[in-house]
Design a protein with these regions (language model features):
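Long, contiguous binding/interaction regions
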Residues: 1-113, 121, 207, 211-214
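Flexible, glycine/charged-enriched surface loops at secondary-structure junctions
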Residues: 1-2, 32-46, 50, 157-158, ...
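A structural-propensity feature for long, helix-poor, extended segments
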Residues: 152-198, 293-294, 299-301
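Amphipathic alpha-helical interface segments
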Residues: 184-257, 273
Length: 316
């Protein structure tokens, strides 16, 4: 059809023979015969993991950091495998997980401007909880950026694996915090749904009370999770301040401040939502945990910012 030789394969076990391994084997075999692999074609759907592994393989082969977004990794795989060579390859319609994925990313799929406008509207959601989670994601992203910038900077070649590992860790935190952006709004909406439940009969009152109890508990657990995930980012942000590219130290500092905003903002949501929790023991548990985590975060960020200022005075 295309006037080219073709190698057809059915990969039945990608744990044994990965997509990129099969492609590379064909490429090497063709090279031995003086031929050039011009691209490849995928028939049907493919698991996301196969393309992610391929993308990371080619990034490592290029001595590039693998701590980039999933979308970028898949883009690298598609380009390196030549999956666009015969016809456009659309990951949204060719990757199994993307085809099955429910449309639950209502806020994180918005543009920056639309998210801001939506927040500014008269609707109570998204509110402080979602904004706190997003601030945390931005903080993690800045730490990730410093890691990736340093990984490819002259003089840091021998530390590629270290900075790439930090960037991968940061990407995972970004994913968790972006999920919590929408999860916080879903938690708030579950309270509204419970409040709208009928309460005429005894059975209806019991069902409504049970739903409210569950919704209130979730409305505390979600921002508390935001606090924990955001606070955990300070470890790698501190490492980027100490070991990263000195020219990017201010970016790491801004990342730390974003994390503090995320933790303290989510902490406010834990406090205000705890008012609806009837279980006094659980209320005390969450309030104490949140207070300790907030205090530790403020202290850690203070040290990071002092470190940043010191680095900037040494490297004007």
């Amino acid at each position: 059809e295309y006037g080219l030789a073709q190698v057809s394969m059915n990969l039945t076990n990608m744990h044994l023979t990965s997509l990129h391994r099969a492609f590379e084997s064909c490429r090497k075999s063709a090279e031995q015969r003086g031929l050039l692999v011009t691209g490849s074609e995928l028939v049907g759907l493919i698991p996301k993991k196969a393309l992610v592994e391929a993308g990371k393989y080619f990034l490592q082969k290029q001595n590039r950091s693998t701590g980039v977004s999933e979308q970028e990794i898949i883009h690298i795989a598609v380009q390196s495998l030549g999956l666009n060579s015969l016809q456009p390859f659309d990951p949204q319609t060719r990757i199994i997980e993307y085809m099955l994925e429910e449309n639950n990313k209502e806020l994180v799929s918005m543009s920056l401007e639309k998210f801001v406008r939506e927040t500014s509207s008269e609707s109570p959601a998204p509110g402080g909880g979602s904004v706190s989670a997003y601030a945390g994601a931005l903080g993690a992203a800045l730490g990730c950026m410093v890691a990736n910038l340093t990984a490819h900077k002259k003089g840091y070649e021998n530390q590629l694996d270290f900075f790439s590992g930090i960037a991968e860790q940061a990407q995972q935190k970004i994913n968790e915090l972006l999920f919590l952006v929408d999860e916080d709004t879903r938690a708030f909406n579950s309270i509204l749904e419970a409040l709208r439940m009928p309460k005429q009969t005894v059975e209806e009152k019991k069902a409504r009370k049970k739903a409210l109890r569950s919704a209130n508990k979730k409305a505390i657990e979600v921002p508390y999770q935001t606090m924990k995930v955001a606070a955990s980012c300070l470890d790698f942000i501190l490492q980027m301040v100490e070991k990263g590219n000195p020219n990017s130290v201010s970016d790491a500092g801004v990342g730390a401040l974003c994390i503090e905003t995320a933790v303290r903002g989510a902490g406010l949501n834990v406090h205000i939502n705890s008012a609806g929790l009837e279980d006094e023991e659980k209320k005390k548990y969450y309030l104490e945990k949140a207070s300790k985590l907030e205090s530790k975060t403020i202290q850690t960020v203070g040290k990071i910012i002092d470190n940043v200022k010191m680095k900037m005075s040494v490297h004007p």
